[in-house]
Amino acid sequence: MSASSPSSAAPDDVEEGLVLRPKFDANGLITCVTTDATSGDVLMVAFMNAEALQKTIDSGDAWYFSRSRAKLWRKGESSGLVQKVLEMRLDCDQDAVWIKVEQGGGAACHTGRRSCFYRRIDRDDTGAPLLTPVDAERLFDPAKVYR
Amino acid sequence: MSASSPSSAAPDDVEEGLVLRPKFDANGLITCVTTDATSGDVLMVAFMNAEALQKTIDSGDAWYFSRSRAKLWRKGESSGLVQKVLEMRLDCDQDAVWIKVEQGGGAACHTGRRSCFYRRIDRDDTGAPLLTPVDAERLFDPAKVYR
């Protein structure tokens, strides 16, 4: 089968087309998964509005939209830990992007960890969920970085 | 600094605790990023409600909640392409999980591709966004798998 989009697909077909037509949700957001370009590990999950997506494409730095602060946000603007985007991908229904980044300072999480995913979900002897710290070393002290 | 949670943190502290306290959104969902345990590539982004999360933890197979169909969904129940979960992780604010899976049949996307992220976002000569197919080979024919 063809490795490219079928010739029968319209250029702006959501799944098979080659035109960017992001499907923003009711809040104007798409999901962004950010991975470390070297290790492949998931660093964080965040959201982009149309402006954040455009700025990321144009600048090559990761921009997000903070739901809690309700504002556009250039990753690293407070901490200096900028994310340089090496590759951007779009999913089948165009409501999620995956960016592979070079993480400035090595730490993406506001808690100082490399990744936001520093706890594994395990089960205890009774089968109940239990969290286990993994890769939970802090690479910076949040109190010193975010003043 | 310590690799485990600070002793000063309460066990049920959202960021530093070791108790699972998922923060579901207004629709009762958390985001799930699913990666291939071998390649590390992002296969898909989907959502879990409380029941999907519990069933995933208990069964070791990936369960999701389909927003479009508004129903609980065991990945592979139509296609047979089940996802075996090798590791689950939780993010800092407990509103996203990352699961590393062994993808049955090798393809996670309903279009037949290995990953839902089969298009790269590039820019054309004028700087406008342009999608380029990458890893876009179909491993199965959706018309034959979903009848």
Curated annotation (Swiss-Prot), chains A, B:
Disulfide-linked positions: none
Catalytic activity, as annotated: 1-(5-phospho-beta-D-ribosyl)-5'-AMP + H2O = 1-(5-phospho-beta-D-ribosyl)-5-[(5-phospho-beta-D-ribosylamino)methylideneamino]imidazole-4-carboxamide
Matching InterPro entries: PRA-CH (IPR026660), PRib_AMP_CycHydrolase_dom (IPR002496), PRib_AMP_CycHydrolase_sf (IPR038019)
GO MF assignments: magnesium ion binding; phosphoribosyl-AMP cyclohydrolase activity; zinc ion binding
Magnesium in keyword set: yes
Record GO cellular component, one term: cytoplasm
TM region(s), chain numbering: none
Details of cofactor binding: Binds 1 Mg(2+) ion per subunit.
Record's subcellular location: Cytoplasm
Protein function: Catalyzes the hydrolysis of the adenine ring of phosphoribosyl-AMP.
Protein name, UniProt field: Phosphoribosyl-AMP cyclohydrolase
Gene that this sequence comes from: hisI
